[in-house]
Amino acid sequence: MEKFQGYLEFDGARQQSFLYPLFFREYIYVLAYDHGLNRLNRNRSIFLENTDYDKKYSSLIVKRLILRMYEQNRLIIPTKDLNQNSFLGHTSLFYYQMISVLFAVIVEIPFSLRLGSSFQGKQLKKSYNLQSIHSILPFLEDKLAHFNYVLDVLIPYPIHLEILVQILRYWVKDASSLHFFRFCLYEYCNCKNFYIKKKSILNPRFFLFLYNSHVCEYESIFFFLRKRSSHLRSPSYEVLFERIFFYGKIQHFFKVFVNNFPAILGLLKDPFIHYVRYHGRCILATKDTPLLMNKWKYFFVNLWQCYFSVWFQSQKVNINQLSKDNLEFLGYLSSLRLNPLVVRSQMLENSFLIDNVRIKLDSKIPISSIIGSLAKDKFCNVLGHPISKATWTDSSDFDILNRFVRICKNISHYYSGSSKKKNLYRIKYILRLCCVKTLARKXKSTVCAFLKRLGSGLLEEFLTGEDQVLSLIFPRSYYASKRLYRVRIWYLDILYLNDLVNHE
């Protein structure tokens, strides 16, 4: 984002807080397209095959697109003529997609500027380790052991495009950008619904920005009520409140909330809760009674339906009791387990046995869902029996082995925090045998004959790499005793969900 701001220093549109003129700057397209393409390539899934990421940037295409935007009537194409109307070999949907990439980059500028201004004068240290997904899990491992209920909420999507436009009004000041955004959004969705496949990947950066702005609006009200009712003040909440007319709107909302829902207001008085949002869901952990958890549940339902005009069913909010139910969280199944401990204490000639019960959070691997994901990608059948990967037989032996090793190491890396490694070994076994069957099929041989010819050294690649790193971290005696395989290890370099989790 600093690179974009450097180019905008000499642009008068930035100083006047107008974003609309930036749509007609050719250098913005160069920066936005390069930034978006690099982001897509960096997040490419190891399971995706033949994905269309090879669209070339062309200055001629951008110039033609800018000329079309000067005459917006030329951008409006009837639905029946979507496939026929094209120039330079591209349909109109391609140009709406380019505009959406540009819009996502441009509108992120006021977000970043206000975010930077809110942190000025505050000594907040950046911790890059907190960006890791695994940094959340040990935090919950320490906190959830003292709680008994978790509210699992599926965050709803807005059912109408106009809701997204209204949310952006608090961030974008000029009306021209909002009108242009509304026009392109409706035209883009009309093109998409007409002839685009459901599973095609279309500008995830743009829709991720829209989704985050939608969720940010919901969390602002929730955190505001939480902050008003709590005696503990957190400076990190202030980032969410620097918007136009926000305090006036919230003050009115708070008065209506107090007058119409006096009973529920007592619910918000100083509750001890933890809130985490992840992958389209959020969890609210607290140590309350079932009655209070049901009040929290209907509070979320009323908040979404009454104040955000989003149809939200109560079935989308699940109340989980950690001692009995499993919580699906970031690809793990978490639950509380009681570990009885017997401590012998001796005082003079008398000895006592003291029974202590320690609550521990179990993080298990959801083996059934992962096997389902592996079966969907043709690594095994629905029962978990390995099969050959027929679509990879055209590659070289080195490429096939390298792809399987990379998948296996990524899974081991992600699920290293599991409390029971038996399911992890089963997943490794499926991938190893699938690799052998794929190589044997490519060489037109049987599995037994293939292993006899190459020996057991073929599978050593699956065992090296991560095990070598762990042997350097832990003492040799500890590593040799095999106790390492029963220890949960959290890594602080995991920034994305595992691909098998995304397939759920």
Curated annotation (Swiss-Prot):
Keywords for this protein: Chloroplast, mRNA processing, Plastid, RNA-binding, tRNA processing
A GO term for molecular function: RNA binding
Protein name as catalogued: Maturase K
Subcellular location: Plastid, Chloroplast
Function field: Usually encoded in the trnK tRNA gene intron. Probably assists in splicing its own and other chloroplast group II introns.
Gene that encodes it: matK
Similarity remark: Belongs to the intron maturase 2 family. MatK subfamily.
One record GO biological process: mRNA processing
Classification lineage: Eukaryota, Viridiplantae, Streptophyta, Embryophyta, Tracheophyta
InterPro entries the UniProt entry points to: Domain_X, Maturase_MatK, Maturase_MatK_N
Biological source species: Arabidopsis lyrata subsp. petraea (Northern rock-cress)
Pfam families in alphabetical order: Intron_maturas2, MatK_N
GO cellular component, one term: chloroplast
HAMAP family: MatK
